């Protein structure tokens, strides 16, 4: 009988200890909320994209000054791409990485498209006459139609462990980060010209950046250490 009482006491203490541990483990600390109040945040945050160090697309005098002697060179580079055929990356190009280890078959058209989009953006910023807008629209639209901006060599980090993009899961790598940044700049500078043609393209760009970059970065457990570092939580 005594042994039974001792056993019950032991189990009771163990259970209470476990509950206490769980309560402490899941206590909300809210470090960021305690670090600053609303008034402090209003003084610290830079709103309405005032942090952008570049002039508006329509400020031609500023862009002429910024481009300087490079203006004509950038325009000429864009002119070579006015008839550029945006390259489709087939499923087999992604699969080639897991079949043979060859990543270039996917990266070659991927890099060509991204470089073309970048060159067209710089050309339009340099000239400002709208000649490159349609091709920029084509490139941005094509980019939004891709299932992923991640390189095939990095896609095995998906839950599927395969090198073909899985629409059910978005991950981030250096390639997708760079592509997302480029798309963000294209949207920032040319949203109004795009909207005059069709506002759907700007909506697609924002949707693609949110789903492929912002959401996985903010929600994935694997990026917690980066978010903590950037928000100062380690302090």
Predicted regions and their residues:
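Low-complexity, Ser/Thr/Pro/Gly-enriched N-terminal "stalk/linker" regions
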Residues: 26-98
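Well-ordered alpha-helical scaffold segments within catalytic/enzyme domains
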Residues: 115-130, 178-197, 233
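Bacterial Sec-dependent N-terminal signal peptides
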Residues: 1-27
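Short, solvent-exposed segments of well-ordered alpha helices
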Residues: 100-111, 166-174, 232
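Short, solvent-exposed loop/edge-beta patches enriched in aromatic
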Residues: 86, 102, 109-136, 144
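Acidic/His metal-coordination segments adjacent to aromatic residues that form catalytic metal sites
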Residues: 98-102, 152-169
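Conserved small/polar residues in nucleotide/adenosyl-binding loops
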Residues: 224-231
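Long, well-ordered core segments of solenoidal/helical folds
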Residues: 78-89, 136-154, 201-223
């Amino acid at each position: 009988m005594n042994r039974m009482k001792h056993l019950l006491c032991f189990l009771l203490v163990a259970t209470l200890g476990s509950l206490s541990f769980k309560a402490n483990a899941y206590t909300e600390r809210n470090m960021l909320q305690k670090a600053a109040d609303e008034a402090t945040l209003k003084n610290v945050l830079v709103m309405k994209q005032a942090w952008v160090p570049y002039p508006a697309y329509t400020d031609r005098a500023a862009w002429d000054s910024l481009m300087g002697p490079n203006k004509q060179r950038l325009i000429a580079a864009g002119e070579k791409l006015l008839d550029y055929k945006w390259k489709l990356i087939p499923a087999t190009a992604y699969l080639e990485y897991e079949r043979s280890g060859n990543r270039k078959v996917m990266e070659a058209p991927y890099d060509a498209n991204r470089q073309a989009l970048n060159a067209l953006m710089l050309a339009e910023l340099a000239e400002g006459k709208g000649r490159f807008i349609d091709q920029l629209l084509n490139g941005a639209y094509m980019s939004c139609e891709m299932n992923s901006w991640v390189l095939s060599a990095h896609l095995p980090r998906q839950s599927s462990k395969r090198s073909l993009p899985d629409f059910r899961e978005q991950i981030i790598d250096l390639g997708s980060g760079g592509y997302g940044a480029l798309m963000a700049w294209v949207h920032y500078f040319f949203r109004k010209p795009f909207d005059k043609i069709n506002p759907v393209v700007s909506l697609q760009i924002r949707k693609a950046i949110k789903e492929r970059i912002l959401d996985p970065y903010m929600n994935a457990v694997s990026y917690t250490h980066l978010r903590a570092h950037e928000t100062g939580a380690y302090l």
